[in-house]
């Protein structure tokens, strides 16, 4: 079992009951499912070949963002922003407290695991031909994971909102929706499909966008994980009202990983923030290193999903 230095968690005091937003047992309705069908059913290759490198020299990140904007525009034609916002406000099932779940692990001076569920990635291609998001998430929960991350981006990761809904039904852990969130429409959708936290990537958002999306998510009782890749992005992220800071060890343009990114940046994060190291964590030794650097949790997917039994791999990573 991996232990870590304790960080101050005063910022994660439980929310007042009155602040909980009313939500229903079925967070996603038919309109959202219908909107999701507008996504192109034939996503581009994710095998890292020519289709993942060209497009007028644009990076994989830029291509995914362009695709996401087009997808959201199409889905808004089916379910306009005003309508999906109204539906999100009507959800009555409480969120599960993503940040608080990590707080409990940190209080025990352990490094928590956010175990990821995804079918594919641009760098690795299809990870599991037998992909069953619900069963994978359940195996993670049994292995001792603190939270689950679900990739819902369709064009390069072959994910969908249906994956997240299936995971929510299968397990009781808090869920991070991992996607390229650029528009308020996606935040409302996240609440409808059952997400407890959303990922916001500093590299793809302008300052006013970031502030708007954080406020919207918080207003819907979801936590926000702000993802950074370098010191400049970290300094910007620390100015916002979000206590979850994710340090991504993957260069989103080259797709290479290096946990030295976390080792360099994590010590710069104030103790009242909770730090998550993302990507490139493969062994319990890696877990120990980032824990010693000040991380409260790690987000791991690919190294687990490559194993025959992802749950057993998660247990080994945690040192159980």
Where are these regions (language model features)?
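C-terminal helical cap(s) of enzyme catalytic domains, especially alpha/beta-barrels
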Residues: 7-12, 265-268, 306-320
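Active-site mouth loops of central-metabolism enzymes
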Residues: 117-132, 174-181, 225-227, 277
């Amino acid at each position: 079992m991996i232990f870590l230095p304790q960080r101050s968690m005063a910022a994660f005091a439980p929310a007042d009951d009155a602040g909980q937003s009313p939500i229903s047992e079925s967070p996603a309705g038919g309109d959202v499912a219908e909107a999701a069908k507008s996504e192109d059913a034939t996503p581009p290759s994710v095998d890292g070949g020519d289709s993942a490198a060209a497009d007028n020299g644009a990076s994989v990140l830029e291509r995914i963002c362009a695709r996401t904007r087009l997808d959201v525009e199409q889905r808004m034609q089916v379910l306009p922003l005003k309508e999906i916002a109204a539906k999100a406000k009507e959800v009555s099932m409480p969120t599960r407290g993503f940040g608080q779940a990590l707080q409990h692990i940190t209080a025990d001076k352990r490094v928590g695991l956010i175990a990821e569920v995804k079918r594919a990635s641009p760098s690795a291609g299809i990870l599991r031909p037998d992909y069953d998001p619900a069963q994978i998430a359940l195996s993670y929960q049994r292995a001792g994971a603190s939270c689950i991350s679900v990739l819902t981006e369709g064009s390069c990761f072959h994910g969908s909102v249906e994956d997240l809904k299936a995971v929510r039904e299968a397990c009781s852990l808090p869920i991070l929706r991992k996607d390229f969130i650029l528009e308020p429409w996606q935040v409302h959708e996240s609440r409808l499909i059952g997400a407890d936290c959303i990922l916001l990537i500093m590299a793809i958002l302008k300052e006013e966008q970031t502030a708007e999306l954080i406020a919207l998510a918080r207003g819907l009782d979801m936590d926000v994980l702000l993802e950074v890749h370098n010191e400049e992005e970290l300094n910007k992220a620390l100015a916002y009202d979000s206590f979850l800071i994710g340090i991504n060890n993957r260069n989103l343009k080259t797709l290479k990983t290096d946990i030295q990114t976390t080792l360099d940046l994590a010590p710069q994060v104030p103790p009242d923030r909770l730090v998550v190291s993302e990507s490139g964590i493969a062994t319990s030794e890696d877990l120990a290193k980032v824990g010693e650097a000040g991380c409260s949790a790690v987000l791991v997917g690919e190294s687990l999903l490559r194993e025959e039994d992802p749950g057993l791999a998660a247990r080994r990573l945690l040192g159980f």
